Amino acid sequence: MKTSIKTLFAAALTTIILGTASVAANATENNTNYTNLTSVKNISKIKISGNVKLILIQDAKESFEVYDNYFAKNALVQQQNGELRISSFTKEALTVIAHVNNVSSIEASNTSTIQTAGNFNLLDLNVVLNDAATADIKANTVNLSTSINGTSNLVLSGSTESYSAVLGTFAKVGMNDFTASNSNVSTAPVIATYSANRYEDIKVDFLETLF
């Protein structure tokens, strides 16, 4: 398996397929109310919080599409030193389609969701889920690490050479279609009661004044 994975990466990292998944095409065709963040480039880390739906597509041509007029929803999008942060605390999820080339870390908190479209071929990937966040990740990696906290839920598919995981007491991980040459899974200590939304006791009107 080790030989096949390295062969895969040699091909994948040399030539990345530029065709995008159908989920992105459909979203563009069916919804013209979006903002294309063309200035966002070279992103290696993505953090989302609140109620954000993130769809990841591996693409040599990076771009980020934020749907449903995020300015009107007072969502926050920040980029600094290769890290992209997106937050939205409205009842309806803010959808973001991210075309990324070599992301190495993704983190979701509150009730946010992460989904990959198509295959991802990466050397290293770190996935962190907090609160009640969920993720469906399909990737082939050399090193994969996950930290699943609160009541979050992670579904993994694909393969890795080395898998390291920290799993919270109430968190869940599905790995029916996932294989690892080496794995190390540990249980995280219970520190405090999780919150599905850390801002649930703050009124939306107050949050809007912050932006």
Task: Annotate the PLM regions.
Residues M1-N130, T134-N149, N153-F211:
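Intrinsically disordered, low-complexity terminal regions
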